[in-house]
């Protein structure tokens, strides 16, 4: 007759149970992940110890995990034929936190065995996840090699104590039975359990089997059942690249991404040395609908020694690469005790840095390819978020800058963004020292801007920046390959003014100074300065931002986002060769000068996409001036 003993949990275990049941894990289904993971550890231990002691296998050739449920008894069971535990090991490993047998086993391993151990139980807490869904847990185990009479049964309701009993157990290994809580019936379902296994344990190194109802020739259920494997038990990323086809890579991508299209590219690397991990990364062909939702969780799937730990491991990839899909499988990546949140440390930083480099290198390769179609597809889908990288990732700013694409005034460009900064530099004329750009709300607004008139006349290409992020982009990317990026709407375009001023007589210069002073006096409350410009050929006037001010386009965007912006006075630039400006110059009556000056200012502001404070006044003013010439 067996003897039953009652033991109290170690104090820390009591605390852990309360914490885990109520708060520690983010979803209750991970109990199965933890128990399958523990079973995998036990099989790993047996496999290695059997190398030096074949008797431990006890004649069983296949190492496997079995998952089942009993609707009537309301139980879920997880069975393995692994190494098992002695009575003392049960007390030490289950009754005591952070003292798991796996951790001690690792300490005793050396050489190549440690590399392939795939052991994940360093924290010794996974077993307690059982109590998230169960109000009683029964564990029956026998150490491989021990007599059948030396089995141990452990049982607890998770309320401060557990019982131990010596029992007979025919087979080595461990069987865990969870007596489910009243509200946990969802786990008494074949499809639900298989779904959890597929999500968390598909790539465990051992087969996971469940009893499946056999079907007859017509596909109908019969009374017979058979044990069927429900996981793949092969991790594609652990296989040599030479043994994998594009179809293999594409199928796995569709599995992890739930994307029906194939990816644009995959990046598969195995790193060995002081840091050991494997990465399999994918570049999607199409952006997800929530790509611009900054609150959405993103990131890679994290595995530790082929055991799934979490989706969306955001520490492993920066925000601007949030579209990258794939897995990181680490042999030594540290996790916190819940295994739900990555610890940010040197190892994480190294994996992240190397992964970012591989993605950027792959994109650079695509961007340089003779066939640009893949990179063009990528840019059309993800170009906006790549621009975030210039702002967020200073270390890789130069690499990212080479990947940027824009539309431009070059004859072959059009509205699609196909022009790189290097393309622009290669087409620069002799003596040109800057890369010129204009920001606008739309392509049509950019191409219609008066600021482009002089650049078109001189045959100087201008980049057309029409994405909302572009204003922030150029505030961080101020030069490329030694060439300054300069806005055509900036007041600081002295190189063109100085060139034109050399051709003027002293008399003309004085006349123009008199014109600007007259206009500035008339509307000094509306402008910071008035200048003669040489950037216009067809328009009478334009407005530019004063030196040190943000651009008008940026100010509009900030206001649209609810930011209170201080009132900025623009610089009004006049085209002295235009008929309307000549008319203004001829006027002596101050009220008339003011009306004409305001008309040219407001017209220029409208051309730049600004909203007038009093549009009705502009219409009245325009009608009055038109009436004068009829």
Curated annotation (Swiss-Prot):
<dbReference type="InterPro" id="IPR001404">
    <property type="entry name" value="Hsp90_fam"/>
</dbReference>
<dbReference type="InterPro" id="IPR036890">
    <property type="entry name" value="HATPase_C_sf"/>
</dbReference>
<feature type="region of interest" description="B">
    <location>
        <begin position="340"/>
        <end position="556"/>
    </location>
</feature>
<feature type="region of interest" description="A; substrate-binding">
    <location>
        <begin position="1"/>
        <end position="339"/>
    </location>
</feature>
<dbReference type="GO" id="GO:0005737">
    <property type="term" value="C:cytoplasm"/>
</dbReference>
<dbReference type="InterPro" id="IPR037196">
    <property type="entry name" value="HSP90_C"/>
</dbReference>
<dbReference type="GO" id="GO:0016887">
    <property type="term" value="F:ATP hydrolysis activity"/>
</dbReference>
<dbReference type="InterPro" id="IPR020568">
    <property type="entry name" value="Ribosomal_Su5_D2-typ_SF"/>
</dbReference>
<dbReference type="GO" id="GO:0051082">
    <property type="term" value="F:unfolded protein binding"/>
</dbReference>
<comment type="function">
    <text>Molecular chaperone. Has ATPase activity.</text>
</comment>
<feature type="region of interest" description="C">
    <location>
        <begin position="557"/>
        <end position="630"/>
    </location>
</feature>
<dbReference type="GO" id="GO:0140662">
    <property type="term" value="F:ATP-dependent protein folding chaperone"/>
</dbReference>
<dbReference type="Pfam" id="PF00183">
    <property type="entry name" value="HSP90"/>
</dbReference>
<dbReference type="InterPro" id="IPR020575">
    <property type="entry name" value="Hsp90_N"/>
</dbReference>
<dbReference type="InterPro" id="IPR019805">
    <property type="entry name" value="Heat_shock_protein_90_CS"/>
</dbReference>
<comment type="subunit">
    <text>Homodimer.</text>
</comment>
<keyword id="KW-0547">Nucleotide-binding</keyword>
<comment type="similarity">
    <text>Belongs to the heat shock protein 90 family.</text>
</comment>
<keyword id="KW-0346">Stress response</keyword>
<keyword id="KW-0143">Chaperone</keyword>
<dbReference type="GO" id="GO:0005524">
    <property type="term" value="F:ATP binding"/>
</dbReference>
<keyword id="KW-0067">ATP-binding</keyword>
<keyword id="KW-0963">Cytoplasm</keyword>
<dbReference type="Pfam" id="PF13589">
    <property type="entry name" value="HATPase_c_3"/>
</dbReference>
<protein>
    <recommendedName>
        <fullName>Chaperone protein HtpG</fullName>
    </recommendedName>
</protein>
């Amino acid at each position: 007759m067996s003897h039953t003993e009652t033991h109290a949990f170690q104090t820390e275990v009591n605390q852990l149970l309360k914490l885990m049941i109520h708060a520690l894990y983010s979803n209750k289904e991970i109990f199965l992940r933890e128990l399958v993971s523990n079973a995998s550890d036990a099989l790993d231990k047996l496999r290695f110890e059997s190398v030096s002691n074949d008797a431990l296998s006890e004649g069983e050739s296949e190492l496997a995990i079995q998952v089942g449920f009993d609707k009537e008894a309301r139980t879920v069971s997880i069975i393995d034929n692994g190494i098992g535990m002695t009575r003392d090991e049960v007390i030490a490993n289950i009754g005591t936190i952070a003292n798991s047998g796996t951790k001690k086993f690792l300490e005793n391993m050396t050489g190549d065995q440690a590399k392939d151990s795939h052991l994940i139980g360093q924290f010794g807490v996974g077993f307690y996840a059982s109590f998230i869904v169960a109000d009683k847990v029964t564990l029956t185990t026998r150490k491989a090699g021990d007599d059948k009479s030396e089995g141990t049964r452990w049982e607890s309701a998770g309320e401060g104590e557990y019982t131990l009993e010596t029992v007979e157990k025919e087979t080595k290994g461990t069987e865990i039975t969870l007596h489910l809580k009243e509200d946990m019936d969802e786990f008494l379902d074949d499809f639900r359990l298989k779904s959890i296994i597929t999500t968390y344990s598909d790539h465990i190194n051992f087969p996971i089997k469940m009893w499946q109802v056999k079907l007859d020739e017509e596909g109908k259920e019969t009374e017979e059942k058979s044990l069927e494997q429900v996981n793949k038990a092969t991790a594609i990323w652990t296989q040599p690249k030479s043994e994998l086809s594009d179809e293999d890579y594409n199928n796995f991508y569709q599995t992890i991404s739930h994307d029906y299209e194939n990816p644009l590219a995959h990046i598969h690397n195995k790193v060995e040395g002081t840091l050991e991990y494997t990465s399999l990364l994918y570049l999607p062909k199409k952006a997800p609908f929530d790509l611009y939702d900054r609150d959405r969780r993103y990131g890679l799937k994290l595995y530790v020694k082929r055991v799934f730990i979490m989706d969306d491991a955001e520490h492993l990839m920066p925000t601007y690469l949030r579209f990258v899909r794939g897995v990181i499988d680490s042999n030594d990546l540290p996790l916190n005790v819940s295994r739900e949140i990555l610890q940010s440390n040197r190892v994480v930083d190294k994996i992240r840095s190397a992964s970012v480099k591989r993605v950027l290198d792959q994109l650079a390769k695509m961007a340089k390819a003779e066939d640009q179609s893949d990179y063009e597809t990528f840019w059309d889908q993800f170009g906006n978020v790549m621009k975030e990288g210039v702002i967020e990732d200073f270390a890789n700013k130069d690499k990212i800058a080479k990947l940027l694409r824009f539309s431009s005034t070059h004859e072959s460009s059009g509205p699609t963004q196909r022009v790189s900064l290097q393309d622009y530099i290669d087409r620069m004329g002799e003596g040109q020292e800057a890369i010129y750009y204009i920001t606008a709300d739309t392509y049509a607004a950019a191409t219609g801007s008066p600021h482009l008139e002089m650049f078109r006349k001189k045959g100087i290409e201008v980049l057309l920046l029409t994405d909302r992020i572009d204003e922030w982009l150029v505030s961080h990317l101020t030069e490329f390959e030694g060439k300054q990026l300069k806005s055509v709407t900036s007041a600081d375009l002295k190189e063109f003014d100085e060139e034109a001023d050399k051709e003027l007589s002293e008399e003309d210069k004085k006349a123009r100074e008199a014109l600007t002073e007259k206009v500035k006096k008339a509307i000094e409350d509306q402008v910071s300065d008035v200048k003669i410009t040489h950037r216009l050929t067809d328009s009478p006037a334009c407005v530019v931002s004063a030196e040190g001010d943000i651009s008008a386009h940026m100010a509009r965007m900030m206001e649209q986002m609810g930011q209170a912006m201080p009132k900025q006075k623009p610089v009004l630039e006049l085209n002295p060769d235009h008929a309307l400006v000549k008319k203004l110059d001829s006027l002596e009556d101050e009220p008339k000068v003011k009306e004409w000056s305001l008309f040219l200012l407001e017209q220029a502001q409208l051309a730049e996409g600004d909203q007038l404070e009093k549009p009705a006044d502009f219409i009245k003013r325009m009608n009055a001036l038109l009436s004068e010439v009829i």
